[in-house]
Amino acid sequence: MTTLPEPLITISPEYLSGAPIFTGTRVPVQALFDYIEAGDPLDEFLQDFPNVSQEHAVAVLEMARRAAIAEASKVAAE
């Protein structure tokens, strides 16, 4: 089992002009969502970006899922 970095995502002006990247890589998080949006399987993303582990990608997707649910709950409560 891979130990995931903390935090999962790094934002620094030193890397990709401050775009969120997978911590420990120079891979933009947006690339993962671009693949998903295009209907490409996670395995294809992982093959194209071998510096990102499956566990790391899934953890970022889970983070996004939790954020979406939290946002939807706030909107529903209004």
Language model feature labels by segment:
Residues 27-78:
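Long, charge-rich, low-complexity alpha-helical segments
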Residues 2-43:
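A short, structured beta-strand/loop element
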